UniProtKB/Swiss-Prot annotation:
MF-aspect GO terms: calcium ion binding; calcium-dependent phospholipid binding; phosphatidylserine binding
Record protein name field: Annexin A8
Placement of Annexin repeats on the sequence: 21-92, 93-164, 177-249, 253-324
Keyword set, alphabetical order: Annexin, Blood coagulation, Calcium, Calcium/phospholipid-binding, Hemostasis, Metal-binding, Repeat
Gene giving rise to this polypeptide: ANXA8
């Protein structure tokens, strides 16, 4: 399933919210869970992981009206560590959360280029526009300008090009002649010459629709006798290679891409908690069920079982509640 279909898949949602929702008792439950000495973490998990993002915003308003305190700030003061990070992530509206992740990836020394690539390469034109709007509202600066200031070279160019959101095309029309020409141009820009015309790769990967690119990849393999992925690996390196490969992966199958990201976060020693939290939170109301299905096919085990092996305590319980039952 490629990325252009992923946002109409209602069966992919793991967090659907409460059908008989009332923010008043939910806010009261959270207040009692954090009142006095100690915290009832399970009560917090039961409420916040089983409500939709829109419902959580209503709970926050009710909490403020009833108790005069900001719910997110109260949660920050009562919780700690990875569990706090996860619960606080749930309190952000989706686009504001992704704007925050992008801002955090660029603030301070160093840049988390993988986070920026992941978000920009996997979102639709409309989603990117909402993220850019939220970013400017929350941080008082342009996302595009901040990316330009924080990155350089061909990586900067591909990220800015992705922000333009030119890839979306739901009409389904593909011009076979143009697809063949693009494939020939990619071959001429890489495998056929000494060196690489990076801008030709960037232009085609960032401005063509997903359906069109799928046809380009087919034609390219016929011409080059190798996949577009193999050519990218041999012609580029570093963050530019990662960005190009991410575009290709998201074009071929978005759900497989996110399954791979989740596995990458948990494989080996240690856990990349930022990647794990971001992808589970951001996909839970979109297509996490579909991602779970692909995860099991790709790695021979369920996402839930991997979370159980790799995390612990309230953090683990909250993640499992968001992920839901296994397919």
């Amino acid at each position: 399933m490629a990325w252009w279909k992923a946002w109409v898949e209602q069966e992919g949602v793991t967090v659907k919210g409460s059908p008989h929702f009332n923010p008043v008792p939910d806010a009261e439950t959270l207040y009692k869970a954090m009142k006095g000495i100690g915290t009832n973490e399970q009560a917090i998990i039961d409420v916040l992981t089983r409500r939709s993002s829109a419902q959580r915003q209503q709970i926050a308003k009710s909490f403020k009206a009833q108790f005069g305190s900001d719910l997110t700030e109260t949660l920050k003061s009562e919780l700690s560590g990875k569990f706090e990070r996860l619960i606080v992530a749930l309190m952000y509206p989706p686009y504001r959360y992704e704007a925050k992740e992008l801002h955090d990836a660029m603030k301070g020394l160093g840049t988390k280029e993988g986070v920026i690539i992941e978000i920009l390469a996997s979102r639709t034109k409309n989603q990117l526009q909402e993220i850019m709007k939220a970013y400017e509202e929350d941080y008082g600066s342009s996302l595009e300008e901040d990316i330009q200031a924080d990155t350089s070279g061909y990586l900067e160019r591909i990220l800015v090009c992705l922000l333009q959101g030119s890839r979306d095309d739901v009409t389904g029309f593909v011009d076979p002649g143009l697809a063949l020409q693009d494939a020939q141009d990619l071959y001429a820009a890489g495998e056929k010459i000494c060196g690489t015309d990076e801008m030709k790769f960037i232009t085609i990967l960032c401005t063509r629709s997903a359906r069109h690119l799928m046809r380009v990849f087919e034609e390219y393999e016929k011409i080059a006798n190798k996949s577009i992925e193999d050519s990218i690996k041999s012609e580029t390196h570093g963050s530019l290679e990662e960005a190009m490969l991410t575009i290709v992966k998201c074009t071929r199958n978005l759900h497989c891409y996110f399954a791979e990201r989740l596995h990458y976060a948990m494989k080996g020693a240690g856990t990349l908690d930022g990647t794990l939290i971001r992808n589970i939170v951001s996909r839970s109301e979109i297509d996490l069920n579909l991602i779970k299905g692909h995860y099991k096919k790709m790695y021979g085990k369920t996402l839930s079982s991997m979370i159980m092996e790799d995390t612990s305590g309230d953090y683990k319980n909250a993640l499992l509640s968001l992920v839901g039952s296994d397919p």
